[in-house]
């Protein structure tokens, strides 16, 4: 038999069972405080060091000794993120937390796990209504309203959801791990093809490229400057009349018009930008050691901070697109680069062009490209299906939590 329901008066909650109430978060705790900024020099990988919540998805460790004694987490605390993703943590006791975290000292009678489930739904409604909101203040958290059943029913709901969510999380973890394995497989398939070819019966010879070992006997090794020319054409056409191109480590070369939204600094004009033609290779000199290199499928312009290379005769740019995005070639870029920190590690044009690469006959380059296009497409389609499954399962998990913490569905008594 379905329960008698009533309107809660709260948009995200909707109707609740007649015997339930609603309550603001501010009435469930006895006070709030923020943590302390802890310098990265005190961050640690030692498993025996103190846990430190940083507003990331999981805590890290710290050996910092001067965290105020009264701020260490206690058994009845919840931690709430102030910035970024609005995570809600049930912390381990005696943990530290950054000043980007709010600690709420919960009332002794409160079921923290039920509150966590309810707050997750409540704060999600704020995210949907205000996607640009960057800060989750104490005032905002205190205003959150959740549905409030009896203590006994809260306990039943928590036990039910903990079991269901643990199973869902296990499936999600396995699926994410399988995606990483497919990515590794793709990288292995590419590396094998661009360094060994796709003919199993060919004779091989030693390679002078450190990470390759052996290459097919008919292949050569040649410096990049001997197969690609440095393109230095500048653009002076107004921004609104050009095809603006960007380079991403994961995605390669993308047209701005194909992006749903652009992040970071936006160009205000394209004067002095570098011209790019179809089949050119674009290189980010700062991040090429992380794979920020790619072929352009388009004519357009790109940032003057990037290098642009055009292929010479008997060079298939797509072959080198695959080759340049291997981890082996990334290590070549790193060895030739220099800088004061990893994210500012530059492989300048002269150093990049001096790197030796394999050089198969053009016919083989094209055969390898055709082979890799097919294989990579197969792997990418499998990954897309798994990502879609993850999206659906995460949506199901959120719906499941919502239905039970608002009383739309009832956990049976046993």
Q: What would you call each of these model-derived segments?
A:
Residues 58, 66-124, 129-132, 137-141, ...:
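A short beta-sheet element
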Residues 27, 114-117, 143, 153-156, ...:
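Short, solvent-exposed alpha-helical surface patches in well-structured domains
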Residues 5, 26-64, 74-80, 225, ...:
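DNA target-recognition patches
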Residues 1-13, 19, 148-202, 359-414:
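Amphipathic alpha-helical coiled-coil/heptad-repeat segments
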Residues 3-36, 52, 147, 151, ...:
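Non-catalytic DNA-recognition/assembly elements of restriction-modification systems
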Residues 29-32, 119, 161, 228, ...:
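Hydrophobic aliphatic residues
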Residues 10, 66-67, 130, 173, ...:
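Short, solvent-exposed loop/turn positions at domain surfaces
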Residues 11-15, 102-106, 142-148, 210-214, ...:
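Short, well-ordered beta-strand elements within core beta-sheets of diverse protein domains
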């Amino acid at each position: 038999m379905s329960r008698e329901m009533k309107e809660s008066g709260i948009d995200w909650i909707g109707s609740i069972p007649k015997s339930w109430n609603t309550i603001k978060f501010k009435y469930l705790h006895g006070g709030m405080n923020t943590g302390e900024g802890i310098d990265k020099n005190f961050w640690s990988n030692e498993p025996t060091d103190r846990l430190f919540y940083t507003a990331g998805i999981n805590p890290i460790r710290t050996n910092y000794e001067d965290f105020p004694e009264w701020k260490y987490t206690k058994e009845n605390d919840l931690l709430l993120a102030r910035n970024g993703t609005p995570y809600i943590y049930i912390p381990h006791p005696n943990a530290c937390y950054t000043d980007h975290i709010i600690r709420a000292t919960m009332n002794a009678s409160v079921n923290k796990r039920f509150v966590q489930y309810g707050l997750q739904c409540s704060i999600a409604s704020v995210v949907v209504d205000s996607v640009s909101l960057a800060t989750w203040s104490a005032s905002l958290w205190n205003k959150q309203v959740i549905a409030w059943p009896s203590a006994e029913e809260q306990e039943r709901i928590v036990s039910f959801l903990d079991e269901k969510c643990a199973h869902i999380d296990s499936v999600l973890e396995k699926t994410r791990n399988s995606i990483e394995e497919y990515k590794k497989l793709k990288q292995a398939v590419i590396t094998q093809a661009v360094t060994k070819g796709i003919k199993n019966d060919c004779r091989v010879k030693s390679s002078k490229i450190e990470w390759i070992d052996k290459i097919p006997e008919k292949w050569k090794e040649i410096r990049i400057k001997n197969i690609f020319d440095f393109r230095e054409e500048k653009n002076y056409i107004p921004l609104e009349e050009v095809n603006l191109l960007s380079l991403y480590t994961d995605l390669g070369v993308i047209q701005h018009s194909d992006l749903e939204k652009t992040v970071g600094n936006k160009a205000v004009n394209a004067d002095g930008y570098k011209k790019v033609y179809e089949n050119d290779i674009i290189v980010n000199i700062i991040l090429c050691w992380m794979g920020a290199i790619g072929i352009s499928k388009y004519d357009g312009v790109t940032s003057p901070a990037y290098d642009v290379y055009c292929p010479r005769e008997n060079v298939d740019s797509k072959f080198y697109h695959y080759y340049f995005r291997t981890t082996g070639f990334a290590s070549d870029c790193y060895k030739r680069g220099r800088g004061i920190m990893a994210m500012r590690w530059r492989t300048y044009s002269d150093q990049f062009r001096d790197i030796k690469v394999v050089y198969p006959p053009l016919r083989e380059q094209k055969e390898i490209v055709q082979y890799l296009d097919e294989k990579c497409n197969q792997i990418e389609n499998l990954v897309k299906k798994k990502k879609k499954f993850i999206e659906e399962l995460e949506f199901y998990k959120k719906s499941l939590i919502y239905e039970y913490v608002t009383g739309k569905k009832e956990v049976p008594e046993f």
